């Protein structure tokens, strides 16, 4: 928006509403020189700070200005761009700003004429866009500003400065971006200056030349006015290491000021301090004109924040006013770490529980095999399990039950795993009352194994004090014994089973036999036997040497009031 600072007259219009419902904000008069590029940005904070649409029109035409970039006059985002200005471009242009519920309009009155900075006989220098009055302060270090503001589609080359038609050279003059720094201003520095640059747009080049009339004054300022830095406010900014950061320095100052606005670090201009790496650069100054003051913005860009930048004050200077920012690492977000840790912990816990549920039986059996002792458990019990089984009426079921109970169970649990079982019909004492024998031996067992078949009346001792009733009553009521329920075949309906069996099924579940009474089914490492062993008391399995199955001769006991008074005689012979 370099044209905003040219010698134009801003005439404020009373806020009025036209027939189309748009409010007129103000009119801007611009006196321009032909044959030069010109751009005007339609901006009016805070109206244009939100989501709005901007459309340019010429005079009262209802046809918008073209947005085709090849057109000499076209709209570029919020700008209207002339490449270049011509004599016939004079007139009033309208910028319509439409928001969701609002409509505002800015008028720009352009006057184009031919004007030369130097005598035309010299040649070589193009026509000026206009003159702008600036002031240097005698005996001080001061600066002149070349107001060249165009949209991002325009690329400006290096700026050259002239005084009285001669290029400026010397140690007292330094070109910094769009500014000419003048050290130790003297009376000879007054005169006519010009700044020249090459503008490139869509592959075409144009020359831009601004004329500046410079006067010298001994006053320190204008009415004692001091620039006001709105932002930054001497504060810290949290920024992650390695990120890109852009910070604006916003300054309000009088329209006729000549204050230098820049960023410094360690009392050195940022561009000079990082001249080699160019990692941190100062941006081009822009400004917005208001009725009584200008709002200037000059930013600093960190292409990549490094550790050396933290804790270092980056100073924004505007005349005698200064303000700084200090970069610092963001404080650790403990809440994020805590939430992440909890999520990870829950995920691990769920995974462990899931894996344990899948491999629970193998894990428990491995632990018992690795760490449990093979010594006899001293708990007053003689047997690891009491085996309770039915007496089916069907011959096939009776044969299957006998094979499982009298052959396979002893082979796997007793011989391979070292458990000691009490099997009614194999280990009872002849001549003793059934109820007493069962009641006494159930109390000497650590587990109760109940084998069921679909034939609910298959239990031959279901009447009165039957074996099943005594064993289940003792296991569930008196001793709190753990019960292992084995289904010889799939049982569809447990409601026809005795209530005690229904209770066991509901409380402990059931293990279904999948074997076929072959040698393969007699391996303790099959899934069925692993499940049975999991429910049995802990014991380290130690395989016995391969011997023939033993024929068990019933043991004779003499019952007494004390367990220690019992005597047992056993005769074991090989079959």
From Swiss-Prot:
Residues 1-19 form the signal peptide. Its EC number is 3.2.2.6. Receptor for interleukin-36 (IL36A, IL36B and IL36G). After binding to interleukin-36 associates with the coreceptor IL1RAP to form the interleukin-36 receptor complex which mediates interleukin-36-dependent activation of NF-kappa-B, MAPK and other pathways. The IL-36 signaling system is thought to be present in epithelial barriers and to take part in local inflammatory response; it is similar to the IL-1 system. Seems to be involved in skin inflammatory response by induction of the IL-23/IL-17/IL-22 pathway. GO terms for cellular component: cell surface; plasma membrane. Keywords: Disulfide bond, Glycoprotein, Hydrolase, Immunity, Immunoglobulin domain, Inflammatory response, Innate immunity, Membrane, NAD, Receptor, Repeat, Signal, Transmembrane, Transmembrane helix. Residues 20-111, 126-211, 222-318 form the Ig-like C2-type domain. One of its GO terms (biological process) is cell surface receptor signaling pathway. It is found in: Membrane. It catalyses: NAD(+) + H2O = ADP-D-ribose + nicotinamide + H(+). This is Interleukin-1 receptor-like 2. It holds the Pfam family Ig_2. Residues 357-575 are cytoplasmic. Glycans are attached at residues 41, 59, 109, 127, 184, 234, 250, 266, 299. Interacts with IL1RAP; the association is enhanced by IL36B indicative for an functional signaling complex and inhibited by IL36RN. Residues 20-335 are extracellular. Residues 381-536 form the TIR domain.
């Amino acid at each position: 928006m370099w044209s905003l600072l040219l010698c134009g007259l801003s005439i404020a219009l009373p806020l009025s509403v036209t027939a189309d419902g748009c409010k007129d904000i103000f009119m801007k008069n611009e006196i321009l020189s032909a044959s030069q590029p010109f751009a005007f940005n339609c901006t009016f904070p805070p109206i244009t700070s939100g989501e709005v649409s901007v459309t340019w029109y010429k005079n009262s035409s209802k046809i918008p200005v073209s947005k085709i970039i090849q057109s000499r006059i076209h709209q570029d985002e919020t700008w209207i761009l002339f490449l270049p200005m011509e004599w016939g471009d004079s007139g009033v242009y309208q910028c319509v700003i439409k928001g969701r519920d609002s409509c505002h309009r800015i008028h720009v009155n352009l006057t184009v004429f031919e004007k030369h900075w130097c005598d035309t006989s010299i040649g070589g220098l193009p026509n000026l866009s206009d003159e702008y009055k600036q002031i240097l302060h005698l005996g001080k270090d001061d600066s002149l500003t070349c107001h060249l503001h165009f949209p991002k589609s325009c690329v400006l080359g290096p700026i050259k400065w002239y005084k009285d038609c001669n290029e400026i050279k010397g140690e007292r003059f330094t070109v910094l971006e769009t500014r000419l720094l003048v050290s130790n201003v003297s009376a000879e520095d007054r005169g006519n200056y010009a700044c020249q640059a090459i503008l490139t747009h869509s592959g075409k080049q144009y020359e831009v030349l601004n004329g500046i009339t410079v006067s010298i004054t001994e006053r320190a300022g204008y009415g004692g006015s001091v620039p006001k830095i709105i932002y930054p406010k001497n504060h810290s900014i949290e920024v992650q290491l390695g990120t890109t950061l852009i910070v604006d320095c916003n300054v309000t100052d009088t329209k006729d000021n000549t204050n230098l606005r820049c960023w410094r670090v360690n009392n050195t201009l940022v561009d000079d301090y990082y001249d080699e790496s160019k990692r941190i650069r100062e941006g081009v100054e822009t400004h917005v004109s208001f009725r009584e003051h200008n709002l200037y913005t000059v930013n600093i860009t960190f292409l990549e924040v490094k550790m050396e930048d933290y804790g270092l004050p980056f100073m924004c200077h505007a005349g005698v006013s200064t303000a700084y920012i200090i970069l610092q690492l963001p404080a650790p977000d403990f809440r994020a770490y805590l939430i992440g840790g909890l999520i990870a912990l829950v995920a691990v816990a769920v995974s462990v529980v899931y894996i344990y549920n899948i491999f629970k039986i193998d894990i428990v059996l491995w632990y018992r095999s690795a760490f449990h002792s093979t010594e006899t458990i001293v708990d007053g019990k003689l047997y690891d399990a009491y085996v309770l089984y039915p007496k089916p009426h069907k011959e096939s079921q009776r044969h299957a039950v006998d094979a499982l109970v009298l052959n396979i169970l002893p082979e796997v649990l007793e011989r391979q795993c070292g458990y000691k079982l009490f099997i009614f019909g194999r280990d009872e004492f002849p001549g003793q009352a059934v109820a007493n024998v069962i009641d006494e031996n159930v109390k000497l067992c650590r587990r109760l194994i109940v084998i069921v078949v679909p034939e609910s009346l298959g239990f031959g001792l279901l009447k009165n004090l039957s074996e099943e009733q005594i064993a289940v009553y003792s296991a569930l009521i008196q001793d709190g014994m753990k019960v292992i329920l084995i289904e010889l075949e799939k049982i569809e309906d447990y409601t026809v089973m005795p209530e005690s069996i229904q209770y066991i099924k509901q409380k402990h579940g059931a293990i279904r036999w999948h074997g076929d009474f072959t040698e393969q089914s007699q391996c303790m490492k099959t899934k069925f036997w692993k499940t049975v062993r999991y429910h049995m008391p802990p014991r380290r399995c130690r395989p016995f040497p391969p011997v023939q199955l033993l024929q068990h001769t019933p043991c004779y006991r003499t019952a007494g009031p004390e367990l220690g008074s019992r005597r047992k005689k056993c005769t074991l012979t090989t079959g």
